[in-house]
Amino acid sequence: MAKIVTLGEIMLRLSPEGNDRFIQSESFRIIPGGGEANVAVSVANYGHDAYFVSKLPKHEIGQIALNALRRYGVNTDFIARGGERVGLYYAETGASMRPSKVIYDRAHSSIAEADPSDFDFDKIMEGAQWFHW
């Protein structure tokens, strides 16, 4: 199968249960995701060799995102580790006439502060048939 490389930010979505609003909720579900990460999971589900390139903190919160990718068979060998933050977004499901709401909190995330020297792009792209970012 094809080697497909995606590069981007995996974030953690924090969502209240059901149709609760942010201000009504005392707890949130954590769901890892993000455009390029979702593409990597999708192509892995189709049997391709999916590689995700990003940067995540070394702490347990970064590990949540890393484990989510691995659970779906995405290769995480090229995820640099460092920095302090995983990007977050809060998603509130709409109900009836109330629209859904999304609030982003991704400033100063590990990937936002990554340096090109954090990645060996020659090695990353070796044998790749497709690059998505």
Model-derived regions: residue spans:
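Glycine-rich phosphate/adenosyl-contacting loop at the front of the ribokinase-like
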Residues: 1-74, 111-117
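Conserved N-terminal subdomain of the carbohydrate kinase-like
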Residues: 49, 53-133
